Regions:
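N-terminal flexible segment immediately upstream of the FAD-binding catalytic core
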Residues: 1-65, 82-112, 263-273, 320-347, ...
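Alpha-helix capping/hinge segments and adjacent helical runs
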Residues: 22, 417-429, 454, 458-462
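C-terminal substrate-recognition/cap domain of FAD-linked oxidoreductases
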Residues: 27-37, 221, 227, 232-411, ...
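FAD-binding subdomain of flavoenzyme oxidoreductases
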Residues: 103-257, 462
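Activity-critical C-terminal alpha-helical subdomain
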Residues: 181, 434-472
Length: 472
């Protein structure tokens, strides 16, 4: 049975209005249905009892202190672009939107950092850094995601192969705890071995441990030269086999992505975004950044020679911003294109060792096809994060789709584990992957997860039923 959370009353609604403002609070049927779910309604549609837009940490603190006292569950929501059913009110209660907390503070040039509130958009932080001649590298596909959401999911993206994940760029965090207290995790320093590294525990915790109110991010000098290569191959298998060849070169790529021609056709057909390379049944897209043209030219030459020596039909250099933009626009349009081309979608977001990518891709296509599902693997092959996109055709009934996707997921996750991989590389556990987590983690690790949750949130009020589930 569910944990006995309090059903909210008019007195509770009035209190939340008193510490925020009446025009920033909605209750019951007043709440827009878009706040019942994230980008994957398949992972749960749950109406909040109250939706509030907060402006500062003091409002969050007051609400959390009250919710803690009254035993009311609270979920924090950013831009709602998650893909795991994470920012949803599974047990009702309060949904707090931090999207009005979107201030980006001036760059700290001496420390090469930038500080922002959680509702600031990733695209705006990247623009602010660029305006100062600096660079914020984490680059997940959804540029309109909030930075708070990026931090609590440890977002990665296409440039992780060279620059790492969001975690690698977080210097310090300010957050409100479940009891309403306000804490700082670390400070704007490069090194810190002062006690347990709680900051890195908070990063990637999916909003289950605390609510971010401010984050300070490391910046890098902006690269002065960049180039995108497109390597077409006769088959997806040949394309995947090329990945370790690229990684063996003495130049670290900024991004390595693969796309099948069928997926490119979906984007072209539905979004009218044209891919500039027409050859090949699959393509490998490789990007390099460099601080000098000489360094960049050396990297491009080495990659092109390796591609042609390993079966590529060509190695096309997207030498202008327009051609490079066309390549990455198609890559960025995959999710939107698939939504337009199918009745429904399901995704397996596994990560496998880079040396096993080709093996995973070959087996994944067979698994999904055996269950009658159209499947389109793609992803960040530079870090082994493969998005296995499953698309529902109009001929499948709801029950057939549900059974086929579940059976496919069971086998795909088992395949990932067999290859030494993990359940999720980017999107997290949320509500959508709960049933598969214990198989990966094991009972001892699940017990550790629960102990960590209780250490932060002893009343289990913050985003309950995500990552781990006490209410079974």
């Amino acid at each position: 049975m569910a944990y006995p959370y309090k059903k909210m009353t008019s007195e509770d609604f009035d209190y939340i209005r008193s510490v925020t403002a009446s025009d920033r609070v909605w209750v019951g049927d007043e709440i827009a249905k878009e706040y019942y779910r994230d980008e994957m309604p398949e992972y749960g549609v749950f109406p909040p009892e109250l939706y509030a837009e907060v402006l500062n940490k003091e409002e969050i603190s007051a609400i959390m202190a009250y919710a803690y006292k009254e035993n009311i569950p609270v979920v924090c929501r950013g831009a709602g672009t998650g893909l795991a059913g994470g920012a949803t009110c599974k047990y009702g209660g309060i949904m707090l939107s931090v999207m009005r907390m979107n201030k980006i503070f001036p760059i700290d040039r001496k420390n090469q950092t930038i500080t922002a509130e959680p509702g600031a958009l990733l695209i705006d932080i990247q623009a602010a850094a660029a305006a100062g001649g600096l660079f914020y590298p984490p680059d997940p596909g959804e540029k309109t995601a909030s930075i708070g959401g990026n931090v609590i999911t440890n977002a990665g993206g296409m440039k992780a192969v060279r620059y790492g994940l969001t975690r690698d760029f977080v210097r310090c965090i300010e957050a409100v705890m479940p009891d309403g207290s306000i804490m700082n995790f670390s400070s704007n320093v490069v090194k810190n071995t002062t006690g347990y590294d709680v900051k890195d525990l908070v990063i990637g915790s999916e909003g289950t441990l605390c609510i971010l109110t401010q984050v300070t991010l490391k910046l890098l000098p902006a690269p002065t030269c960049t180039c995108t290569l497109v390597m077409p191959f006769r088959s997806l298998e040949e394309c995947a086999d090329m990945v370790p060849k690229v990684l063996e070169l003495p130049f670290v790529p900024t991004a390595i992505e693969f796309l099948e021609r069928e997926l490119i056709d979906i984007v072209e057909r539905n979004l009218n975004k044209m891919f500039p390379v027409k050859q090949g049944e699959a393509v490998l897209i490789v990007m390099y950044d460099a601080s000098s043209k000489q360094e960049l030219d050396s990297a491009v030459e080495a990659a092109a020679e390796a591609a042609l020596a390993n079966g590529a039909l060509d190695c096309c250099i997207a030498g202008t911003p327009e051609r490079a933009g066309a390549v990455w626009s198609v890559r960025g349009g995959i999710l939107e294109g698939m939504k337009a081309d199918s009745v429904a979608q399901e995704e397996c977001d596994v990560v496998v060792p880079r040396a096993r990518i080709a093996e995973y891709v070959k087996a994944a296509k067979k698994i999904a096809s055996a269950h009658g599902i159209r499947v389109e693997p793609c992803g960040h092959c530079g870090d082994g994060n493969i998005h296995t996109e499953m698309l529902r055709g109009p001929e499948m009934s709801d029950q057939e789709w549900k059974e086929a996707t579940h059976a496919s997921l069971v086998e795909l996750y088992a395949l990932s584990k067999e290859l030494g991989g993990q359940l999720s590389g980017e999107h997290g556990i949320g509500n959508g992957r709960l049933e598969f987590l214990e198989e990966f983690a094991g009972p001892r690790m699940i017990a550790l997860y629960k102990a960590i949750k209780l250490a932060f949130d002893d009343k289990l009020i913050l985003n309950p039923g995500k990552v781990i589930e006490y209410n079974k």
